[in-house]
């Protein structure tokens, strides 16, 4: 049976994309409505009476999601959608295309390692596999950090406190100078900020946190009392003194006191660091990219 391709209609197609997701992915990855809602562009494969596949596109340079219904797999549909999505992104001027993340928004950082067929799909089509990343979680209702978690930072004269309105300019200046790729996340103003300051009052580190009821695409999996911690950063001159661990531990305590249950930390390679702060690995991802002008 032949198939044809058409543009994604983000709103009109939302219902069947949810059905396709449920059919193509295992129960460990149930449909994520907020993730589906963020798909604003892409290509749809149709066969017979309706759609059977999707390649979402983020013109900023990523393919956030690609799915083919199990009944229509191994017919070249996924390969065709991927090639067309790459062509669309190259035509828009993308210097590099990444799988899953890399655009303005993302459902997951990379291709989930527990979706082995998805990992093979990109690996066998000329995509470059970089480092793996992981997400971690902690049950804050049972969170008991080590008694020494904040001692090293405290002995170095570091104090921790959530931001007030007067801190906003200083926080953004710190991010711009130290972690420029995070400026947009801190500038959004939709999450709380925890600051580590040295004895002179200068910012030595920051992180973002939100919960319970955090606005996260993974809420259907994490639960209604979910929280998130992200963008944990310590100034280079202060690294290695326990400040990062102190920040994560304190943010976790604040979230737990507010009623957060599962706290999620996404997109990191620092497994041992977060384990020391009381978190455990949850999901792992392979990071894939495709150079411009390469074969698909």
Describe the predicted segments one by one.
Residues 24-42, 53-61, 179-234:
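A conserved beta-strand-loop-helix scaffold within acyl/acetyltransferase catalytic domains
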Residues 83-156, 288-290:
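Acyl-donor-binding surface of acyltransferase catalytic domains
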Residues 1-34, 51, 133, 147-182, ...:
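Short amphipathic alpha-helix that is part of the acyltransferase structural core
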Residues 74-91, 231-234, 240-253, 257, ...:
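Conserved acetyl-CoA-binding loop-helix of GNAT-fold acetyltransferases
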Residues 63-74, 102-105, 229-239:
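A short, internal acetyl-CoA/4′-phosphopantetheine-binding micro-motif in the GNAT/acyltransferase core
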Residues 63, 97-99, 229, 262-266:
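Conserved hydrophobic beta-strand within the GNAT/NAT acetyltransferase core sheet
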Residues 53, 131-134, 204-205, 283:
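A structural microfeature
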């Amino acid at each position: 049976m032949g198939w044809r391709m058409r543009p994604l209609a983000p709103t009109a197609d939302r219902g069947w994309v949810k059905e396709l997701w449920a059919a193509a992915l295992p129960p460990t990855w149930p449909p994520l409505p907020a993730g589906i809602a963020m798909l604003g562009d892409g290509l749809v494969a149709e066969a017979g009476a309706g759609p059977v596949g999707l390649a979402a596109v983020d013109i900023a340079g990523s393919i956030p999601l690609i799915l083919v219904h199990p009944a229509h797999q191994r017919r070249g549909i996924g390969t065709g959608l991927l090639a067309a999505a790459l062509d669309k992104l190259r035509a828009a001027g993308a210097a590099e295309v990444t799988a899953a993340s890399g655009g303005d928004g993302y459902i997951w950082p990379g291709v989930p390692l527990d979706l082995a067929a998805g990992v093979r799909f990109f690996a066998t089509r000329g995509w470059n596999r970089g480092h793996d990343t992981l997400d971690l979680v902690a049950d804050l209702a049972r969170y008991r950090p080590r008694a020494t978690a904040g001692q090293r930072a405290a002995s170095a004269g570091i104090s921790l406190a959530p931001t007030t309105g007067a801190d906003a300019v200083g926080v953004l200046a710190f991010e711009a100078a130290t972690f420029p790729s995070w400026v947009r996340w801190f500038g959004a103003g939709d999450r709380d900020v925890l600051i580590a300051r040295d004895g002179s009052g200068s910012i030595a580190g920051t992180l973002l946190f939100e919960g319970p009821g955090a606005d996260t695409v993974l809420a259907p999996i994490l639960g209604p009392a979910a929280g998130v911690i992200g963008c944990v950063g310590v100034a280079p001159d202060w690294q290695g003194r326990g400040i990062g661990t102190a920040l994560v531990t304190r943010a976790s305590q604040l979230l737990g006191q507010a009623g957060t249950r599962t706290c999620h930390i996404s997109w990191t390679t620092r497994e041992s660091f977060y384990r020391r702060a009381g978190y455990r690995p949850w999901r792992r991802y392979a990071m894939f990219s495709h150079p411009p002008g390469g074969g698909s």
